[in-house]
Amino acid sequence: MIVKTDRTSPTVSVAGAVKHNSDLETPAGEEGVSEILDGLFSYGTKTLDRLAFQKALDDIAANESAGFSFSVNVLKEHFPRGVELLADNELHPALPDKAFAVVQHQTADYVAGELQSPGYRTSRALDLALLPAGDPVLRQTTPASVKKVTLDEVKQYHAATFRPDLTTIVIIGDVTPEEARTVVEKWFGAWKAVGPRPDTTLPAIPRNKPSAANVSDAEAVQDSVTPYIL
């Protein structure tokens, strides 16, 4: 945890990140599970449904988001409550059945469009040219793989990848390091890592041969060139 005291205004901003790499951590056959999980954090927690959770945030005029990157911005007087809500959402998301079905469908539709986009196809062509066969980055999320993911797999992925030993929290604002530590330990202190620490570092990339790829884009008004040297 990093704390920077700043008395400029009576506010506190909390930003955190859980180090992860979905290319390495996603189980085989579950491509898309990370994207579905990310879309479910806005549906409340195990103790507060979506509307109740949003009301709790509105009551203290806080802006909050949860996921592998998480944050809350709040007035100093509501700092403890803001961190409490953030921790509840981050560690105990509701992951409800009905919301899962909605988010899964939305994710599948989004992926279907993304796979056809010139930007994605250009990026994919570069990856195929630069990376060896079997490289984790070459794993591809498809509408079919998204539709195969189950809610239990989403819950298991959350439990396996959200770990305190891979998390950094930065707090900036009208708060001392001692105050910040007390609050964070109160609401995040019970968070424990379970199982071996996952590998989040991609393998080294071997030398590759020169190559070129052409990606068509019917809507482009001119050609563009993307050089890539590795």
Stretch-by-stretch model annotation:
Residues 15-81, 116, 136-140:
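M16/MPP (pitrilysin/insulinase) zinc-metallopeptidase core fold and M16-derived inactive scaffolds
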Residues 16, 35-37, 57, 70, ...:
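Buried hydrophobic packing residues in well-ordered domains
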